[in-house]
């Protein structure tokens, strides 16, 4: 009888151990996938950078840095504008992370007029102002009484008038300067020319539709859009080493305090690359000059 009881106890112990072993095996099996999952972290989503720009040359230059930014984990969205007001408005309102279309004097003028606090994050390029003519091949051929079309806004208007004075077409006060600014009303002697100030983005179109003999002072980017070449078509231009070149360098603008953010610094680094400088040099034939 004792042997039977001992045998029963032994068998019970064996089954008990087997049960413990079988219950622990699935636990190990269910833990394994969890460990594997822990090593497979989801890929980070690309960080978006939204930049407003005028089409030529700014948006074209921005297109050149999309791949470089993608390699750094950024997706570049380019919003194209055809005027000088909306890109700053959108930036101030937070729709854009940055814009790239303007120079510092225009940016400063916009801030003063609109109570905004937008700043330059980097200098990228310069677009020489040029004098272009309808049926005129040199400054000396500009006929008496000809119409001269210039941009109307303060900063671009000043620049245009100083270039006209440089070429002897008008006379301005002795203290006329980029810093002080001048308007059509400040012209001391127009030498019989009819100087008309119009919205900057319409100057080129108005020249194309004007009477023969008309000339116009056109912003570099609008000249490009209209098919003009500084090297081939301009009757006169600003020098690339002039005060105008330094003053009117085109900048990447951002909201104050964001110029050193990671994505803005990534954007600036990409734009100030050797590849972009080469693109500018080879593409724009002197109409756009890299300043980095």
Model-predicted segments: where are they?
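A conserved helix-loop-strand patch within extracytoplasmic ligand-binding domains
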Residues: 121-170
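Ligand-binding "clamshell"
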Residues: 109-121, 136, 226-239
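Short helix-initiation/N-cap motifs at beta->coil->alpha
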Residues: 78-89, 177-205
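A bilobed periplasmic-binding-protein/Venus flytrap-type ligand-binding module shared by bacterial periplasmic
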Residues: 128-140, 247-261
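Alpha-to-beta junction loops
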Residues: 92-102, 146, 169, 192-194, ...
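Periplasmic-binding protein-like
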Residues: 156-165, 271-291
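Short, well-ordered beta-strand elements
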Residues: 45-56, 74-80, 147-148
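Bacterial lipoprotein signal-peptidase II cleavage site
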Residues: 16-33, 39
């Amino acid at each position: 009888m004792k042997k039977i009881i001992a045998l029963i106890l032994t068998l019970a112990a064996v089954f008990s151990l087997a049960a413990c072993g079988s219950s622990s095996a699935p636990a190990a099996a269910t833990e394994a996938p969890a460990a594997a999952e822990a090593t497979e972290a989801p890929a980070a989503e690309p960080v978006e950078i939204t930049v407003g720009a005028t089409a030529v040359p700014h948006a074209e230059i921005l297109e050149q840095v999309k791949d470089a930014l993608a390699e750094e984990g950024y997706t570049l969205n380019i919003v194209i504008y055809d005027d000088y007001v909306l890109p700053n408005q959108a930036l101030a309102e937070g729709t854009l992370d940055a814009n790239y279309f303007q120079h510092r004097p225009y940016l400063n003028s916009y801030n003063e007029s609109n109570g905004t606090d937008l700043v330059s994050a980097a200098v990228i390029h310069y677009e020489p102002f040029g004098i272009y003519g309808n049926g005129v091949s040199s400054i000396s051929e500009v006929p008496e009484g000809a119409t001269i079309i210039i941009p109307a806004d303060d900063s671009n208007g000043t620049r245009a008038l100083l270039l006209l004075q440089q070429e002897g077409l008008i006379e301005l006060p002795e203290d006329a300067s980029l810093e002080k600014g001048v308007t059509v009303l400040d012209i001391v002697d127009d030498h019989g020319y009819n100087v008309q100030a119009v919205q900057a983005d319409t100057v080129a179109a108005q020249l194309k539709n004007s009477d023969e003999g008309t000339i116009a002072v056109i912003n570099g980017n609008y000249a490009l859009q209209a098919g003009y070449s500084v090297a081939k078509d301009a009757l006169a231009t600003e020098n690339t080493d002039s005060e105008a070149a330094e003053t009117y360098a085109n900048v990447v603008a951002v909201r104050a305090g964001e110029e050193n953010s990671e994505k803005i610094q990534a954007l600036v680094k990409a734009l100030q690359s050797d590849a972009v400088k080469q693109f500018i040099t080879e593409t724009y034939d002197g109409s756009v000059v890299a300043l980095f």
